[in-house]
């Protein structure tokens, strides 16, 4: 993906999660998206069927409270190399298929080479907690908004 996919990402996030469009657009601009490692899945007709948006933003940007609650934990996590999953959206008719797996596996060699873990913040109301837990992600912190997972790679 490239920065040219910013509006596409915002549209998908608004449609999928019901977030405010202006807020999502500011996230896309301000949260250090790693466009080269983000994945856009296309079907055989070149329609977008999935987005995996990776970001270089720091854990404390997602959950500033961790600095007060767990200063040693955040210090140890920030001593490692990590990347964040900002959003992972798959079209309704592709859920339950291999698409999620294939999208993540398409970047896994580079992730394993350049990072120690993947930071995965998941809003409490979303259904992807079990998905990441099945991958082996471990909860390391939670706040009022989300649960933070760490997936060692």
Where in the sequence are the language-model features?
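A short beta-loop-alpha structural element at the N-terminal edge
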Residues: 1-10
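Helix-loop element at the rim of GNAT/NAT acetyltransferase active sites that forms part
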Residues: 10-24
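A short helix-loop-beta-strand connector motif used in the catalytic cores of GNAT acetyltransferases and
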Residues: 29-40, 44, 50, 55-62, ...
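A structural microfeature
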Residues: 49-50, 141
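Conserved acyl-donor/pantetheine-binding loop and adjacent beta-alpha core of acyl/acetyltransferases
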Residues: 53-87
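Conserved GNAT acetyl-CoA-binding A-motif
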Residues: 82-83, 111-124
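Glycine-rich acyl-CoA binding loop
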Residues: 85, 96-104
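Conserved beta-strand-loop-alpha-helix junction that forms the acyl-donor binding cleft
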Residues: 90-95, 107, 119-133, 143-148
């Amino acid at each position: 993906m490239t920065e040219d996919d910013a509006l596409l990402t915002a549209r998908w996030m608004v449609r999928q999660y019901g977030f405010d469009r202006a807020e999502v657009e500011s996230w896309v601009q301000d949260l250090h998206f790693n466009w080269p490692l983000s994945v856009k899945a296309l079907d055989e007709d070149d329609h977008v069927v999935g987005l995996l948006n990776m970001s270089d933003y720091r854990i404390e940007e997602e959950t500033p409270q961790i600095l007060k609650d767990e200063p040693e934990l955040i210090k140890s996590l920030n001593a490692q190399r990590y990347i964040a999953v900002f959003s992972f959206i798959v079209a309704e008719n592709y859920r339950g298929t291999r698409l999620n797996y294939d999208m993540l596996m398409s970047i896994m060699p580079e992730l394993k080479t350049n990072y120690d873990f993947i930071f995965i913040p998941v809003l409490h109301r979303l259904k992807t907690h079990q998905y990441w837990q099945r991958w082996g992600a471990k909860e390391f912190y939670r706040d009022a908004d989300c649960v933070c997972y760490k997936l060692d790679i």
